[in-house]
Amino acid sequence: MARNSISDELIIETSARLSNKVGLDNLSLKMIAEELDIKSPSLYNHISSLDDIKEKLMIYGWKELGEKAIDSAVGVSGYDALRKMCYAFYDYTINNKGVFQAMLWYNKFKSDEMANATIKIFGILHKILEPLNISSNNVEHIIRTLRSFLEGFSLLVNNNSFGNPISIKESFDLSLDIIINGIKSLEGVD
């Protein structure tokens, strides 16, 4: 690959692909450079460290997930849209294990760039929930609950932590039904 064809975007996309393949903890600058057919020091023209790449992977993942979640909810509204977004989240996280690992330590209050990474997904959740006559305070609690469930469930699946032979899909479906029924109980409550 020609040296001048290396871009920040290509480095992050390559890092995402590699982290999904070998795991975020096994990702190295040497591995990324080899994949790009460049020498490791050349990466420093674009990034400052492996931690910098991991932070960019986190932002990349949240943005990509936001697009997929929004696409999943096109043409539906209310609880159907919420359900479709949850399935899109789950599908993304189990199919992008390395990127998801980077996304886990997201804190939107760390920087404006991080806050902007999730603006789409959290914005659409607000748009779905607010017409359901749910208070803005409860919407924030619901978003935390959804994030905790989706990230936690996906993390357990990705680490093969469900040893019971019952269907993981059935467990996910039932858990989501329980959460949605709980959300419905908050309609009209301050």
Model-inferred region functions:
Residues L10, T14, L18-D52, K56:
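Helix-turn-helix
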Residues I11-S19, G61, L65, F89, ...:
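Short hydrophobic clusters on alpha-helical segments that form packing/core surfaces
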Residues S19, I53-G61, F100-M103, N107, ...:
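Alpha-helical DNA-contacting segments of helix-turn-helix folds
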Residues I59-K84, F122-P131:
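Amphipathic alpha-helical linker/stalk segments
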Residues I70-G98, S136, I142-L146:
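Hydrophobic alpha-helical connector segments
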Residues Y90-D112, F153-G163:
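Amphipathic alpha-helical segments used for helix-helix packing
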Residues A102, S148-P165, I180-V189:
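Amphipathic C-terminal alpha-helical segment
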Residues K108-S136, E140-R144, E170-N181:
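Amphipathic alpha-helical packing segments from all-alpha helical-bundle domains
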